[in-house]
């Protein structure tokens, strides 16, 4: 009887292994997994896939993740009249497109020798018309093992890549101030990134890389009124400006909740460390003030960004956190990284406490496992780091806890000078 039970278990295991090892077809949509990685003005990624593909110097790269080595027979679901080159590493295939309608076009077989992200490049060689054609899907047949890529998920969010966060543990009691230091390493400096240093339950405060000619220090507070349109907020629930720093722009924002926004155009530099100081204090009348200060390391002075009043709110500092995100879907193939160090909290009584514990979390893009290029952790010099994008292979599980040694000394702040800003 016992032998029969063991035999049944072995047969079941063999059946599961056989089913799991069955070759599969992986259909990778270009609209969610493709990028123009060279000469971006010569092709576009749209809901139809690769379109407006006119420049032979443009390269379109398609990414997907495989969990084990395998061979794969590649095809394209494409249309057009042209010759294109399809490359995997050093192996290239010349492919002729000869159809006005979308059809499956064989490419060739590749040998994928290790688990991780696979990159397939497309480049135009010659064309009979204005365009090299349109590519809707990359198809990989006879693949063994599991795969991950943007599928049954928003192309927009999938192409942006996963946002990653660090939540810091506060001491007991009421916290009024949060202090954090941020450094963007040269290798992590990527346009359209938000390196957020001092987040809180009702908003955030950090640095952005907006364009080749513009960088910002951004501070935003959400309204207590839940809407995506700031024009819908009733007057008694609007964020009110109390103080404004020199050269700081004040406005509204929407699409992810609505509220008050402020930013200072400031040419922060990769490799330099900048200080962020955030105050949250109830006013005793059912409202709370939020005040953000930025230490301009290059000028060696504190700057006031803004002070806002949030109505119908009675809170001290809650949920201090940092995050890293890419806000351009065209840039999701590039990696970005940031270091955070020397975190301190100051109680309403004026006592500083060194914060040493952080918890790593991520957004829905990572939770859905459509992107696996997300990380957080410790640096060798006792700081925390966040990294995302660029299709690297090593990810960190949601909820992983990190610890840094309680080194450093409490921030030296001239409180009276801050009040005069």
Residue spans for each PLM region:
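Bacterial Sec-dependent N-terminal signal peptides
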Residues: 1-23
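Extracytoplasmic
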Residues: 22-267, 275-282, 286-421
